[in-house]
A protein has these predicted regions:
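Membrane-embedded alpha-helical bundles of multi-pass transporters/translocases
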Residues: 2-314
Length: 315
């Protein structure tokens, strides 16, 4: 019994730290990369914004293609698990390179930033999409799936909170007043940890369930999705939600740096913005057991909209 419990928790923690790894890099991108480009690397804000828009659009296509790759993958390690091993080292390396300032002119820096950011986004897709798709292959037990998801949420939120709270203090400590060096060394810390944890995750999880399905082509997938109106409505909603998320997180550092004039508040607010949603996430299963999921979503959206309205009104 003890061995079974040990094996279960080994997989649970192995599954969860993969999300922790992804969030170490994801939070660095969403919270600090734009600020790094404009205020540390010295790139024009217009071109940085355009670069982020283009990369996000390309990344959306890459997500769909990665799903098709997973559907057509068959190895001795399973369908999803191999990509944690394949992507671990390049993922951490590109995180580091994205926060490096090369000795180029403005045009050279723009090209360097675009290439490294685009490659980092591809590598995030390479490890994160398979990780997100992995759960059905780990177990058939619905309770164990719930436990795995809970551990993932907890550790993923921990990773996001660590980056939100620790990044700017690390930049100051490691850079000793030089933001260029500080961001680079901080990226080295998070990149190395992310790579290590992805390798540990690969080592400690196993795809125990074999799901047989017909191979899917891009054309067949598009025909199927085109006929699915609820999917299109939900996809538009997700697009708008993530657009708002990137706008808020990208502006957070600028807001406290230029408008409030207190950089220390950035870590506090960014940390709370990753921890507080965790409480909401943990209440969803309880609410979903008492209400229709659609109603839960509508109520939560209404609360969020009202909160944003009040916040913007005060500002």
């Amino acid at each position: 019994m003890a061995e079974t419990t040990f094996t279960l928790w080994r997989q649970r923690l192995g599954y969860g730290i993969a999300d922790l790894s992804c969030n170490l890099v994801w939070q660095m991108i969403s919270l600090y990369l734009m600020f790094f480009y404009t205020d540390v690397m010295g790139l024009p804000a217009y071109y940085v914004g355009l670069m982020f828009l283009v990369t996000r659009l390309v990344d959306g296509v890459a997500d769909v293609l990665m799903g098709l790759v997973i559907d057509n993958t068959a190895t001795r390690w399973g369908r999803c698990r191999p990509y944690l091993l394949i992507g671990a080292i390049p993922f951490g390396l590109l995180c580091i390179l994205a926060f490096y300032v090369p000795d180029f002119g403005t045009t050279g820096k723009l090209i360097y930033a675009f290439v490294t950011y685009l490659c980092l986004s591809f590598l995030y897709t390479l490890v994160n999409i398979p990780f997100c798709a992995m759960l059905p292959f780990l177990t058939n037990d619905s309770r164990e799936r719930t436990t795995l998801s809970a551990v993932r949420i907890l550790l993923g939120s921990l990773g996001a909170t660590i980056v939100a709270v620790a990044t700017l203090p690390l930049v100051g400590a490691l850079g000793k007043g030089n933001q260029e060096h500080g961001f680079f060394y901080t990226a080295v810390v998070f990149g190395v940890i992310a790579t290590f944890f992805l390798l540990v995750s690969f080592r400690n999880i196993k795809e125990n369930i074999s799901i047989t399905q017909e191979r899917m082509t891009l054309k067949r997938a598009w025909v199927s999705l085109r006929a699915n109106r609820p999917w299109f409505v939900f996809a538009i909603n997700i697009f708008l939600m993530w657009g708002a998320f990137f706008f808020q997180t990208g502006a957070l550092v600028y807001f406290f740096h230029y408008y409030v004039g207190n950089n220390d508040l950035t870590a506090i607010v960014a940390g709370s913005s990753t921890f507080v949603p965790l409480l909401g996430t943990l209440t969803v299963p309880l609410l979903a057991s008492r209400m229709k999921k659609r109603h839960v979503y509508l109520v939560a959206s209404a609360i969020n909209l009202r909160s944003e309205e009040r916040r913007v009104g005060k500002e």
